[in-house]
């Protein structure tokens, strides 16, 4: 017998979300961003399912990329953070990786390595101030990369700070800065669009888009679910009721006795906790479903368990009943909101303890 906690991942939903991203920006090629274990969905399984259709994959670092190559992935793979040590350029050449480049040290190390790289994505700091060169320096970097004889093509890339906030003018300012840099360089392919940008902003035609969170059916925008904006949520996290007990009015539950029964009712204990990735800071009232009926968190989240109550106390929970923690009509975005965080964090913090089950177009495994 196994602990009844399962993350069911709909791979076909991820593929359809990728196709939707390309439909929204039809002149662009698209990465499938599978960093951080495909946002907690399983990078190898997701990439294997998408490999025959995607234009390329994108990950954060070289160890993620090597793991995909070792799993048989043949599509191009971009390192979004570039290399961290000069020796990694040789590995990029060996495995055919593309890489971001954002500073003089990386450029010097590339030139010293003599490695041949098909595509280098030069990171422009258009205002986020994490990584990248400025618009005055960008033409110098592009010339150096082209003159090195080591790089097949240079792409100019940037990242937007506030694309998920349609009322914020920062994105327009960053786009203008990017275009100024691009014009000073001359003809060069562009990559500017993350999920929020793909869905709501105009981007340069013919470049590369980088759908990330939207691939997994999760909204990049606050206060709306992925399903409500045309995405297909890919993950359902489910478990079972493993114990029930009758509470009397005034009984207190859990660590810190953080839940007090306002009336007599049946309490259910469910096999999931923060040791699995369920958010410890989820508050009383966080939604879930038991046997298809609305229920909510009642008491502090433990490492391995939570305690819950039915919304309608006449619906008494029973041992072995199915529990949906998020997915379906329990949006992960809503659960995240109750925990004071975002859907990105919930899925990427999934641990190795849940059993993963993958649904494909023609069946399941």
UniProtKB/Swiss-Prot annotation:
Residue positions of the active site: 35, 255
Pathway: Amino-acid biosynthesis; D-alanine biosynthesis; D-alanine from L-alanine: step 1/1
Pfam family, one: Ala_racemase_C
UniProt keywords, alphabetically: Isomerase, Pyridoxal phosphate
Positions of substrate binding: 130, 303
GO MF annotations in UniProt: alanine racemase activity; pyridoxal phosphate binding
Transmembrane segments: none
Isomerase keyword on record: yes
One Gene Ontology biological process: D-alanine biosynthetic process
EC numbers for this chain: 5.1.1.1
GO CC, any one term: cytosol
Cofactor(s) listed in the protein's UniProt record: pyridoxal 5'-phosphate
PTM sites of type N6-(pyridoxal phosphate)lysine: 35
Reactions mediated catalytically: L-alanine = D-alanine
Superkingdom per UniProt: Bacteria
Class in the EC hierarchy, top level: isomerase
Family the entry assigns: Belongs to the alanine racemase family.
NCBIfam families (UniProt xref): alr
Record's function text: Catalyzes the interconversion of L-alanine and D-alanine. May also act on other amino acids.
PANTHER family in alphabetical order: ALANINE RACEMASE, ALANINE RACEMASE, CATABOLIC-RELATED
Name of the protein described by the UniProt record: Alanine racemase
Source organism: Marinomonas sp. (strain MWYL1)
Gene behind the chain: alr
